[in-house]
Amino acid sequence: MSKVLCIPDTHLKPKMFDLAERIIDKYKPDYAIQLGDNIDDFYSFEDDYKKANAKMIYFKYKFPNTIWLYGNHEVHALIDRPVTGNIYCSKTYAKLYQENFNPKLVHIDNKVIFSHAGIFNNFSLLNEDNLNNLDLNELAKADSPIWARHNYDKNLYVNNKYKNYIQVVGHTPEREIREDIVDGCKIISVDVFSTNWNKKFGEEKMIIINTLTGKYQKIDIDFRNDIY
């Protein structure tokens, strides 16, 4: 059993790691997992990338058992098909992320699957090792673990291999942490820190999930209005 702090898409918001640090200090989870998309905000400059990268490096060294995942923004920058407003920075810092943080596509702990967007369709036939060994170019698909949008794509399904699992995902901005059922599989969406034209959009909370029971706690810690 593990208690895991889930850090959703940060998109160059370094103070999300300040919040995560305070949560870890107070609630003592076994480890944290970051769900990808640390790069790219469409209103960003190189200085924003430098500040965010410095904060991530600090967090990595303070909490070395943190697990880091790929998001669609990192993967597409690495395969030279960036989805960003700052192509130079996204490619440079995606490479730094790959080299320094050893990101994975998927992490499974007991009966909980962590990925950027969810494991569906033919991807849900693969085990954890095979998923993590996929060529990054194979992920440029609408149903892939970095692109799937389970709230909108009604053609997604989950093979029997993972039907009894819970999935924790980021990727799709939500106003609140929410649960959905896709083909019998519970999906918990936690991307609630995204902004709309630089204005707060989601409830800005993180969860700690028990990977044995699947129960989770929303963590509500005020981290001041100066995050942006």
Model-derived regions: residue spans:
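A general structural motif
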Residues: M1-S2, K28-D30, F63-N65, N110, ...
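Conserved beta-sheet core of the metallophosphoesterase superfamily
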Residues: H150-D220
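Short, solvent-exposed aromatic-acidic interface loops
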Residues: K218-Y228
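Active-site-proximal loop/helix segment associated with metal-binding centers of metalloenzymes
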Residues: Y88-A94, K104, I108-K163
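Beta-strand-turn-beta hairpins that frame and shape the catalytic cleft
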Residues: M1-L5, V106-F114, D183-K186
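Active-site neighborhood of phospho(di)ester-bond hydrolases with catalytic His/Asp-centered motifs
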Residues: C6-P8, A32-D37, I67-N72, F114-S115, ...
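Short catalytic/ligand-binding loop motif for oxyanion handling, primarily in non-cytosolic enzymes
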Residues: D41-Y43, V75-I79, S115, N121-S124, ...
